[in-house]
Every structure is written in structure tokens, then in C-alpha cells.
């Protein structure tokens, strides 16, 4: 089944009101989340931009009879304080109160993992949702950086290394593995850490 855009929502009340299970994609602004989503769908549905902070709504997509949600990016410095707070509140509410949600795909930049990413992992762990950390832009790292990053990422984020996958939306590296692991999030309840 081909992927398609369903709707955008600015708050939980505007989200689809049904019982279809969902997996959401979240990540810092400018980590290549939209490009990764498009690679996952094999179709350009999520809007990509060189300007960080473009996604400020919850964007719902349907693919293979499953629902996926592109969440606004967090941590973009050029947003106003009010905008940052609104996005933080929306993300927190969605993770904690969206009953359809069965899993979270946290997209990070392979080369720049932040304390903010670490805090988001803590928040995800507190929800009890199953999750997967996708380290995108792996193609931008040299061989030495790849080795060190793979060893440090799970330790820094305090998660099981099996929860971390290195990919490149640009080159297609590990996208088939990612595809399979994301669909597994619909089956699992809770996470092993």
C-alpha cells in the first residue's frame, strides 16, 4: 500500500479520533527527520527544508495500513521562547496522553548527540513506550568517527545498543533494516533497556 498524508493537527484534540495504532518520529531540528521519513515511505510526503524548525504541527501519514506521525522538531534556537514552550508542551502531551501511540522513533544526528537528546530518551523511557533510536547522517562520519560513535551512543543515551540503528537517508545505508525495526514497534509492548 502506498503512503499517503492524512492530516495535520496543532493539538491532541485535532488528532484523528479512532483506535488505529501509531508510531511517531521525533528529533531535534535539522537532524534529517523529514528526509528519513521520506526514505521510509519511499515517497516525498514529509516537507524537507534547509531551514530548521519547519515542522510545527503533528503530521499524520498512513502506510501499509499503519499510522505514522511526524512530530515537530525540538531544540531549535531561533524559535521564540513561546514557540519553544508550545512545541515542548505539545510533544510532552502527545507522548504521555496519545492512547493510539505504540512506539517512538527518535531520530538523532550521528555526529552530534546532545544532552537534549539524552533528556528526550529519559522522557520516552518514562512513558513505557517501545522505541528505536535512529542515528541519521551516518554517511557524514569518517571510518574512525563511525567506530567511536557506535561505541559511545548507547552508553551516552543510557539505552540498550539493540535500540540504536545507524542509517543514512541520503545514501540508503541500513534503510531496509530500519524499515523492519520500525514496523516491529507496532507489535511490541514496552521496551527492553
From Swiss-Prot:
Residues 19-188 form the EngB-type G domain. Its cofactor is Mg(2+). One of its GO terms (cellular component) is cytosol. GO terms for biological process: division septum assembly. Mg(2+) binds at residues 34, 55. It comes from the Bacteria. GTP binds at residues 27-34, 53-57, 70-73, 136-139, 167-169. InterPro entries: G_ENGB_dom (IPR030393), GTP-bd (IPR006073), GTP-bd_ribosome_bio_YsxC (IPR019987), P-loop_NTPase (IPR027417), Small_GTP-bd (IPR005225). Keywords: Cell cycle, Cell division, GTP-binding, Magnesium, Metal-binding, Nucleotide-binding, Septation. SUPFAM superfamilies: P-loop containing nucleoside triphosphate hydrolases (SSF52540). Gene3D superfamilies: P-loop containing nucleotide triphosphate hydrolases. CDD domains: YihA_EngB. One of its GO terms (molecular function) is metal ion binding. HAMAP family: GTPase_EngB (MF_00321). Necessary for normal cell division and for the maintenance of normal septation. Belongs to the TRAFAC class TrmE-Era-EngA-EngB-Septin-like GTPase superfamily. EngB GTPase family. This is Probable GTP-binding protein EngB. It comes from Mycoplasma pneumoniae (strain ATCC 29342 / M129 / Subtype 1) (Mycoplasmoides pneumoniae). The lineage of its organism: Bacteria, Bacillati, Mycoplasmatota, Mycoplasmoidales, Mycoplasmoidaceae. The gene is engB.
Amino acid at each position: 500500500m502506498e503512503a499517503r498524508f492524512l492530516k495535520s493537527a496543532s493539538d491532541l484534540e485535532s488528532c484523528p479520533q479512532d483506535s488505529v495504532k501509531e508510531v511517531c518520529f521525533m528529533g531535534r531540528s535539522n537532524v534529517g527527520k523529514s528526509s528519513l521519513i521520506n526514505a521510509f515511505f519511499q515517497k516525498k510526503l514529509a516537507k524537507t527544508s534547509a531551514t530548521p524548525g519547519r515542522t510545527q504541527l503533528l503530521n499524520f501519514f498512513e502506510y501499509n495500513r499503519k499510522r505514522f506521525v511526524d512530530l515537530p522538531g525540538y531544540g531549535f534556537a531561533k524559535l521564540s521562547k513561546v514557540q519553544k514552550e508550545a512545541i515542548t508542551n505539545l510533544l510532552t502531551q502527545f507522548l504521555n496522553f496519545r492512547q493510539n501511540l505504540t512506539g517512538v522513533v527518535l531520530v538523532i544526528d550521528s555526529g552530534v548527540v546532545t544532552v537534549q537528546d539524552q533528556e528526550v530518551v529519559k522522557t520516552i523511557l518514562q512513558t513505557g513506550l517501545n522505541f528505536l533510536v535512529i542515528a541519521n547522517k551516518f554517511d557524514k562520519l569518517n571510518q574512525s568517527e563511525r567506530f567511536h560513535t557506535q561505541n559511545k551512543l548507547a552508553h551516552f543515551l543510557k539505552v540498550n545498543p539493540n535500540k540504536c540503528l545507524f542509517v543514512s537517508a541520503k545514501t540508503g545505508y541500513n534503510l531496509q533494516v530500519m524499515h523492519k525495526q520500525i514496523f516491529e514497534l507496532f507489535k511490541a509492548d514496552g521496551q527492553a533497556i
